[in-house]
Amino acid sequence: MITIRDVARQAGVSVATVSRVLNNSALVSPDTRDAVMQAVTLLGYRPNANAQALATQVSDTIGVVVMDVSDAFFGALVKAVDLVAQQHQKYVLIGNSYHEAEKERHAIEVLIRQRCNALIVHSKALTDRELSDFMDQIPGMVLINRIVPGYAHRCVCLDNVSGARMATRMLLNNGHQRIGYLASSHRIEDDAMRREGWLHALQEQGIAASESWIGTGTPDMQGGESAMVELLGRNLQLTAVFAYNDNMAAGALTALKDNGIAIPLHLSVIGFDDIPIARYTDPQLTTVRYPIASMAKIATELALQGAAGTLDITATHCFMPTLVRRHSVAWRQNAVLITN
């Protein structure tokens, strides 16, 4: 598929210049316009009609693409976007993608057709190339929890590796060495980075984690429960587990209680995200806070600035997670044989 970037390369101009030509901007010289249109004809490029429509209209809607708005984490993201939208007298339209490339692509395209010239996109399935093509066409498109090279000023991210290392170090500092990881079955960057942080923290202490220390499930309570049961069935004598997210950690607590294992007396559990459920589990969940509301607010402001052409292209927006100490982690007791 021929993209706007291919046209820019053929004409020897920037993507922004091609966009101005295609949108009939007066800020382009006749020679440049001719060069661009010759490249368009030569390559057979077909401009995105949706993007062209957005370039000539002011929109009162902001689009958001998330994995699943019914998930508490993504619900918090959307709520934060809506708070900023209301301050700017705008409305929010939402697309669910379920971490599937085709659904992510379709959600973005639908929101563009709905005249959303500011988009906040949580994308895990589309390639960097496809996302950058969308971002070239839509100046108000911002990514959250994803960095695409060359577009860092339009990306809002979290240091997942540091967050996972922080969680694992807390367990290590409480005397734990045999620390399991409850991994997400969704093959996305977040899980890979959290697994990396867990491994690095263990390696720093000379601990070689076995693949058998990893239980895998869907990133929800049911998945956490099944992943914990998987680990229990291996009789690994783990004394602590770090979960991919709080939902999985909550599911793990259920599995442990069902097997008569006291938390944190016999086994410590730490989560990631600090969604509301973390305060209401029994015991309350020690976790790593993902500042998703703050990140979503920044992303929305950036999207509006991008749509208005006022973005600072030198800025970067990477957040650090913080540790939230509650009651699911304690000093390691003598390891007990865990049976299913």
From Swiss-Prot:
Keywords: DNA-binding, Repressor, Transcription, Transcription regulation. GO terms for molecular function: DNA-binding transcription factor activity; transcription cis-regulatory region binding. The keyword Cell membrane does not apply. The gene is galS. InterPro entries: HTH_LacI, LacI/GalR-like_sensor, Lambda_DNA-bd_dom_sf, Peripla_BP_I. This is HTH-type transcriptional regulator GalS. Repressor of the mgl operon. Binds galactose and D-fucose as inducers. GalS binds to an operator DNA sequence within its own coding sequence. SUPFAM superfamilies: lambda repressor-like DNA-binding domains (SSF47413), Periplasmic binding protein-like I (SSF53822).
